[in-house]
Amino acid sequence: MPAPLFSHVPVLSEAVMDAGRQMPRAEGLLIDATLGGGGHSALMLEQQPGLRLIGLDQDATARAAAAERLAPFGDRVTIVATNFAEYTPPEPALMVLADLGVSSPQLDVAERGFSFRLDGPLDMRMNAVGDGATAAELIDRLEENELADLIYAYGEERLSRRIARRIKADLAVQGAYSGTAALAYAVAGCYPPQGTPRRIHPATRTFQALRIAVNDELGVLDRLLQQAPDWLEPGGLVGIISFHSLEDRRVKTAFLRDERLERITRKPVVATEEEEEANPRSRSAKWRLARKRLID
């Protein structure tokens, strides 16, 4: 059977499956808060026949692909069309799992507007049918200093003021950008020439900042970190895969300071050289795991 169009290789799968072996019981509920194509969930359901899954995703394409991938598990699987920040589970879970990365299929579809390598509309909304502002509307609405602050805060981009100045100047002269490629070209032009290839594309941090802002990703993550311990039964696990330092710092701090939780991973688990070679997306992935404290 051909793989679903949304399929991708789940990162740090060994760490996730190892966590599955540390759950307090072999039978119960797994909540995948970022279902995507269902890769991690499929591995967990195969490894743990007593698990039932509730998978959450606001992306209709992802839900359709996950439904196909998880069909062999029948009524053990429930897929819910929601953002995890807006969800309340029907019963306590053995484990809550979240993979915070933008999936390769989302990046590879130009129409979604996430990619600076493929020209598409400046959208960047995870929920493409929602009523939230697009990236194009965001950069048009913000003042130059506000845009610079956003790019610096969410993209950790040292040239944020130069980039914001260029963007607002372009908008004043030519109107809205024609698409993602035009914005990426403008951002790249803010960098001085360099003889050797750059490690990452010059537009990477700016696009990250806009995507985070459009989808309120850090606010949504904060709500998940606050809610997840209440979703768990005592001894249950919460495991999160992050892909940049803004996310990882939040996860690390929450796992350290939340009195409901006990850290299992003192340092984040990262990909092996072999996994990085096989799956380049894993290079920036970090896995942290915590356990809900037992009730005295």
Swiss-Prot record:
Q: What is its main location?
A: cytoplasm
The alphabetized list of GO BP terms reads: rRNA base methylation
Q: What is its EC number?
A: 2.1.1.199
Gene Ontology CC: one annotated term: cytoplasm
Which Pfam family, any one, appears in the UniProt record?
A: Methyltransf_5
Q: Where in the cell is it found?
A: Cytoplasm
UniProt GO molecular function: rRNA (cytosine-N4-)-methyltransferase activity
Which reaction is this enzyme known to catalyze?
cytidine(1402) in 16S rRNA + S-adenosyl-L-methionine = N(4)-methylcytidine(1402) in 16S rRNA + S-adenosyl-L-homocysteine + H(+)
The UniProt function text for this chain reads: Specifically methylates the N4 position of cytidine in position 1402 (C1402) of 16S rRNA.
What is this protein identified as? Answer: Ribosomal RNA small subunit methyltransferase H
Q: Which organism is it from?
A: Parasynechococcus marenigrum (strain WH8102)
